[in-house]
Swiss-Prot record:
GO terms for biological process: amino acid metabolic process; pyridoxal phosphate biosynthetic process; pyridoxine biosynthetic process. The keyword Transmembrane helix does not apply. It comes from Desulfovibrio desulfuricans (strain ATCC 27774 / DSM 6949 / MB). Pfam families: SOR_SNZ. PROSITE patterns: PDXS_SNZ_1 (PS01235), PDXS_SNZ_2 (PS51129). Disulfide bonds: none annotated. This is Pyridoxal 5'-phosphate synthase subunit PdxS. GO terms for molecular function: pyridoxal 5'-phosphate synthase (glutamine hydrolysing) activity. Catalyzes the formation of pyridoxal 5'-phosphate from ribose 5-phosphate (RBP), glyceraldehyde 3-phosphate (G3P) and ammonia. The ammonia is provided by the PdxT subunit. Can also use ribulose 5-phosphate and dihydroxyacetone phosphate as substrates, resulting from enzyme-catalyzed isomerization of RBP and G3P, respectively. Belongs to the PdxS/SNZ family. D-ribose 5-phosphate binds at residues 23, 152, 213, 234-235. It catalyses: aldehydo-D-ribose 5-phosphate + D-glyceraldehyde 3-phosphate + L-glutamine = pyridoxal 5'-phosphate + L-glutamate + phosphate + 3 H2O + H(+). Pathway: Cofactor biosynthesis; pyridoxal 5'-phosphate biosynthesis.
């Protein structure tokens, strides 16, 4: 890829539509994800549930781990950089990862600026809780957006909240007279030209995936019904009783989200799901979704 134009980068992200992206920490997990039908894997040192449990500062994964996963995977490999840490992102780009996630799962490195993603060849994915956050990230060069949800909880409620918030605000924008769009853009803290584009297209100008707390095939199918283009699954697979079977079931659920009889069938005997966390028990300052601006 010689030139990382936004058209080219968003085109690469479009290729993942209708798919499932799975967090993996070892080459063995990467093969399980690939055999289950994942469209890409996210290479990590620790899944979000373990990052949450360990506390402290979470940084970019050791390049050795990322490289080992890249060596065995024949599907695209993503990796996470800290919010604002453009050097971590440059390191990952130099290694040849297919996508970089500027992620709130890791401890932010800059409390004022996100990475300027326009100057990179590699496409970026970023999280959002609302339309304003989504459009600010797109203005910075993000080629793909996902809900933030609340990672590492196995609780889908925040992903649902963020998805509905974005969709509601898109509908609100589309219903506005054009003369009122500049004020809407100002209130959102989003570029006017992107607001006008969303109003014209009736959706975000990039692929929009669900992420944060998805643990079951039913969770994944619900996010597709809400209008997402695909699903990220973090801790929900490899923190469960039968990762290979659950991974296959979630891929099938995303592909066949309208077939409720099939959803019932693939949801049988998946082993123990990951232990979930009720969001209200997480103190406000410890919620990963609050990272970023």
């Amino acid at each position: 890829m010689e030139q990382g134009t936004i058209r080219l980068k968003t085109g690469l992200a479009e290729m993942l539509k209708g798919g499932v992206i799975m967090d993996v920490t070892t080459p063995e997990q990467a093969k399980i994800a690939e055999e289950a039908g994942a469209c890409a894997v996210m290479a990590l040192e620790r899944v979000p549930a373990d990052i949450r449990a360990a506390g402290g500062v979470a940084r970019m994964a050791d390049p050795t781990i990322v490289k080992k996963i890249m060596e065995v995977a024949t599907i695209p490999v993503m990796a996470k950089a800290r919010i604002g840490h453009f050097v971590e992102a440059r390191i990952l780009e130099s290694m040849g990862v297919d996508y970089i996630d500027e992620s709130e799962v890791l401890t932010p490195a800059d409390d004022k600026y996100h990475i300027d993603k326009r100057d990179f060849t590699v496409p970026f994915v970023c999280g959002c809780r609302n339309l304003g956050e989504a459009l600010r990230r797109i203005a910075e060069g993000a080629a793909m957006i996902r809900t933030k949800g609340e990672p590492g909880t196995g609780n889908v409620v925040e992903a649902v909240r963020h998805c509905r918030q974005v969709m509601d605000e898109v509908r609100m924008l589309c219903a506005l007279p054009e003369a009122e769009v500049p004020n809407f853009a100002k209130e959102m803290g989003a570029p006017l030209e992107l607001c006008l584009l969303v109003r014209k297209e009736g959706r975000l100008p990039v692929v929009n995936f669900a992420a944060g707390g998805i643990a079951t095939p039913a969770d994944a199918a619900m996010m597709m019904h809400l209008g997402c283009d695909g699903v990220f699954v973090g801790s929900g697979i490899f923190k469960s009783g039968d990762p290979a079977k659950r991974a296959r079931a979630i891929v099938q659920a995303v592909t066949n989200y309208k077939d409720f009889a099939l959803l019932a069938e693939i949801s049988r005997d998946l082993g123990e799901p990951m232990v979930g966390i009720e969001i209200s028990t997480i103190p406000s300052g410890e919620r990963m979704q609050e990272r970023g601006w």
